[in-house]
């Protein structure tokens, strides 16, 4: 168990008055968690301090070689005023999988969860009260060695910051338009596609901007070898309901193993759906749309939760989905998952963790 030193701010920030205008990741709570790592000593100096900048040398490793990872989680306020997390142990384990791939030291999962809970408890007044809003939690770790040599660092900093946030997409739960990217790729076998590291997201920005210029909300990535099979959307995993069955890319190293994805697959199987995790060609998706068999498409992720898709655009061909409306299964998944997260529905799966 961590011995966390807490230093509370003497100048608390003014909290947002209108939670309908929170946006995503633009406002930050009063405090942050910090912990440092030194080779031979391990993790030490766990602390919660007032939120603010810290000084770093221009030659710090992370600036040059991108040895960093992060996670994305949320804290929810129930109608009874209780605060709870959603499957934080899954985030802790995925964080360590990312750390291993980037040659960084792991954090014991119980310490990771303890740190998150401690910070949320200190800043519990920052957890929004309004329906659909939550406290977004961003744990991250960076290499803090100073020097330009290319090697695994011997010093790291683990930090957690929190941001009260509303809907991730400006459209809210309205169905979005997705552009299928067939020039740029997000990941390839043997690389870092399954991790949450900044490089994956940096490499996706250009394609995302080009898609936005064309009026699309996100990019759907194809596999990096044949540029043929669907993998994931920029900030989401993605699922297709075709002729009553659910298809999604398998987590074989190029797709992020999403916590929301995992939860939705468990829900779907519990409801009797056949879920097929494997290769799905974009050509087969478009053919299913032409034949009227593509019933629903939806993205899944911590930030967006469930995001319905109304249109796929690939090589000038357009697949219109669900008549541009939210499909019934998509709506049921959203209502069920958010119901559990916000404490409106019974958590029979044991997914929520109280912050007390």
Spell out what each predicted region is.
Residues 1-119, 140, 147-356:
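Helix-start/capping segments and mature chain N-termini
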Residues 128-138, 142:
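Extended, Lys/Arg-enriched charged tracts that mediate electrostatic binding to polyanionic substrates
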